[in-house]
Amino acid sequence: MGQVFLLMPVLLVSGFLSQGAAMENQRLFNIAVNRVQHLHLMAQKMFNDFEGTLLPDERRQLNKIFLLDFCNSDSIVSPIDKHETQKSSVLKLLHISFRLIESWEYPSQTLTISNSLMVRNSNQISEKLGDLKVGINLLIKGSQDGVLSLDDNDFQQLPPYGNYYQNLGGDGNVRRNYELLACFKKDMHKVETYLTVAKCRKSLEANCTL
């Protein structure tokens, strides 16, 4: 009986610590989701503003090229649809999100379109990406249980953005900016989706459907 009474304070302290860790984890998830939502909105606005500077025929042509082309970050293996996203573990979604954010650290500094607002946005984006990367890394550490086992493909090196965009052709400057902004918007949407699903799973909500 005495041993039971001795164990009770230990169990209570353990329970409080566990609850505190869960609350801190949710707080970090809330911050991360809010940050990536803001980045996604900024990406959408920058893309729309840039499209507004193009002639209708030019816009249609670039859109056709982009649909047939690919983003540099497509080298990162990620879920191909909603069903696969929901089947993925929280840890896998966090690692993919981390890689996607990391892949934009350099190209975010090259969004120097001839528009002062966009240049200011590109500086803000670089800072926000860095903060989000740190936050996701903390979430990975907080969610990790034992040794993570992922395919080697999940950690393959990305080709450098500079080399990729050097091969865009004669009108590469306009096309390069279009593809950078379109790919950035697409990737921020991906990260927003993955972090939202991961946050929902960690909150133990009954329904985490997209």
Curated annotation (Swiss-Prot):
SUPFAM superfamilies: 4-helical cytokines. This is Somatotropin. It is found in: Secreted. One of its GO terms (cellular component) is extracellular space. PANTHER family: SOMATOTROPIN, SOMATOTROPIN,PROLACTIN. PROSITE patterns: SOMATOTROPIN_1 (PS00266), SOMATOTROPIN_2 (PS00338). The lineage of its organism: Eukaryota, Metazoa, Chordata, Craniata, Vertebrata. Belongs to the somatotropin/prolactin family. Disulfide bonds join C71-C183, C200-C208. Growth hormone plays an important role in growth control and is involved in the regulation of several anabolic processes. Implicated as an osmoregulatory substance important for seawater adaptation. GO terms for biological process: animal organ development; calcium ion homeostasis; growth hormone receptor signaling pathway; hyperosmotic salinity response; magnesium ion homeostasis; positive regulation of growth; positive regulation of phagocytosis; positive regulation of receptor signaling pathway via JAK-STAT.
